[in-house]
Amino acid sequence: MKDFIEWKDFTFQYDVQSEPTLKGINLSIPKGEKVLILGPSGSGKSTLGHCLNGIIPNTHKGQYSGIFTINHKNAFDLSIYDKSHLVSTVLQDPDGQFIGLTVAEDIAFALENDVVAQEEMASIVEMWAKRLEIAPLLSKRPQDLSGGQKQRVSLAGVLVDDSPILLFDEPLANLDPQSGQDIMALVDRIHQEQDATTIIIEHRLEDVFYERVDRVVLFSDGQIIYNGEPDQLLKTNFLSEYGIREPLYISALKNLGYDFEKQNTMTSIDDFDFSELLIPKMRALDLDKHTDKLLSVQHLSVSYDLENNTLDDVSFDLYKGQRLAIVGKNGAGKSTLAKALCQFIPNNATLIYNNEDVSQDSIKERAERIGYVLQNPNQMISQAMVFDEVALGLRLRGFSDNDIESRVYDILKVCGLYQFRNWPISALSFGQKKRVTIASILILNPEVIILDEPTAGQDMKHYTEMMSFLDKLSCDGHTIVMITHDMQLMLEYTDRAIVIDNGLIVADDHPINILSNTELLKKTHLKKTSLFALADRLGISPQKLTQWYIDNQGGKNG
């Protein structure tokens, strides 16, 4: 069926805003198509999704003109009940989606509403839990899970409903690399088995292209810039021009001078012909040179129950100005480690900070040494307005109004938030809220800054601005610790990586060496970047190609 979902000359403006967010949209999606929606933060892609699932106009009010239909019916005339049977949504923020007290109850919620028999309900819940590898979590509270585990629970909760339209709002944001690849494979299988019209809003382009996508729609400033096949999009400069991170191998091949015009298939490295490509001389890998030791963590163990340690006798050192990535699969203990370092949870570690034993710090004392930016911005925000949230730490420390205004404006500009300085935080997107929380910590200038998934939900422009800013802090002597699932970030912007698996440090090395260890990657759910696959095709050392790429395009300031 053609035009299953259709927008004709569609414009939408929120009541709280002076300009339309969507401007004259013309887009048709046939039944059963799989479409990727791209765009920088604030481009209108999430607003389009909210129109589709009924959040607009039922929750977010505004004015619209033009036509928007689902299955040839005016979408805004459909009741919430009717819309819920048409569209199932996996939200960007999984905490906003939970209903049940346990994982099993949450997955079963839609089935309960449809009065499914209890025995059949239990069977369906168990099936989806196994397929998403969350069966051991069925009795746990969703709020107690890691970010990636929460996303899997949210996904299971909508997949049980068999809706004809599946909407995924950044489903990979909190998933480790291998789990992200697995989820995209699962989404593709569901798309084919159920013939569901599948719409994916996502920044992690390289991971989405792991499976086939019928079409890509690129948004910018509320308008459609590109609407067509993925292969043709990758031949253009639209991605970099409009703030979307290109697949690593595409960026590398552009720097190598590869002629894309003769290339038909762009989404698979295996389909490229490199017989005429000239490879420049590439230097050996830069190894990390330790500076002065800043923090020594000794024998850190954390247990949430009497039987199992979430962290088991973890010891490591941090150095001044170092950029460290902490990586590992979902639930490995990465966020628990950060919380323990900040004294948020009880632990028995010995911490030596600048040659002083600070093991008995209060939370306030520890906060003056180590700043922590949480993965979920909603857990940090306490003020109604953007300016007040970023200024709060300075006000509590007695800074003058003039000094506060100057420093807040400076940090808001760095974080790409200056235009929102007088906005209510409730009007911001999830990615914009994330930048607000990062700004509120960075403004206090702590010597160690821990960031849990600092770039999740960020477009390329704000990703680059944020990482360049963190690079500058590193050059100024700050130690930057990033908990991340982003292997490209780890390669470009860190000097060292610690891999955690089941509460243990299983590797501590240069990021390139980590990604060269195939057995380690498989065990810990990490994944080589496409630079390694490209190096294999080119017949050169992946270490040299990665170092060459970093020299030409990556983080250089550290």
From Swiss-Prot:
CDD domains: ABC_cobalt_CbiO_domain1 (cd03225). GO terms for cellular component: ATP-binding cassette (ABC) transporter complex. It is found in: Cell membrane. ATP 2 binds at G328, K329, N330, G331, A332, G333, K334, S335. The keyword DNA-binding does not apply. It comes from the Bacteria. It is an enzyme of class 7 (translocase). Its EC number is 7.-.-.-. Keywords: ATP-binding, Cell membrane, Membrane, Nucleotide-binding, Repeat, Translocase, Transport. ATP 1 binds at G39, P40, S41, G42, S43, G44, K45, S46. Residues 5-246, 295-527 form the ABC transporter domain. Belongs to the ABC transporter superfamily. NCBIfam families: PRK13648.1. This is Putative ABC transporter ATP-binding protein SAG1633. It comes from Streptococcus agalactiae serotype V (strain ATCC BAA-611 / 2603 V/R).
